[in-house]
Regions:
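Generic preference for well-ordered secondary structure
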Residues: 37-41, 72, 103
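Short, surface-exposed loop/helix-turn segments at secondary-structure junctions
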Residues: 68-74
Length: 143
């Protein structure tokens, strides 16, 4: 059996370097996620948050900026929609994001940079209100 030539601490870090999302991304998804992360940096996301943001974006939308998830009640009626990269819920957040000056209409959440700005505001909202940073994505993130 061949032993690793890397010291155990370095080996452990190298195994952590690939996020869960990156491990399961198709090449096309990886290109989309790379683009999303580039845009996230442009709109003010901190470098330390980018690996987990990538995980969230891949998990929520497969890094598709025009992704729409429909939430339905027990009769099948659509009650709300989750929009864009970060799948921001229109029913929960449109009014707040309008009041913050981030969007003018719900459909603005389908614009890549706007969606990422809105997601950053939701992360900041969580921190301001004493929640875990990634609280808005707790159903998917496992955090």
């Amino acid at each position: 059996m061949r032993k690793s030539i890397l010291p155990p601490a370095i080996l452990a870090l190298s195994l952590l370097a690939t996020s869960p999302a990156e491990a399961s991304e198709t090449p096309q998804e990886a290109r989309r996620c790379d683009r999303a992360i580039q845009l996230a940096r442009e709109v003010g996301w901190l470098k330390k948050d980018l690996p987990y943001l990538r995980y969230i974006l891949h998990r929520e939308s497969r890094c598709q900026p025009d992704s729409i998830g429909r939430n339905r009640d027990i009769t099948g009626k659509v009650t709300s929609e989750d929009l864009g990269y970060a799948q921001i819920n229109d029913r929960s957040w449109v009014t707040y994001l309008k009041n913050q000056g981030i969007i003018r209409t719900r459909d603005d959440l389908l614009k890549p940079k706007t969606n990422l700005k809105a997601a950053l505001e939701l992360l900041r909202y969580s921190v301001r209100h004493g929640y875990d940073r990634w609280h808005q994505w707790r159903g998917t993130s496992g955090k």
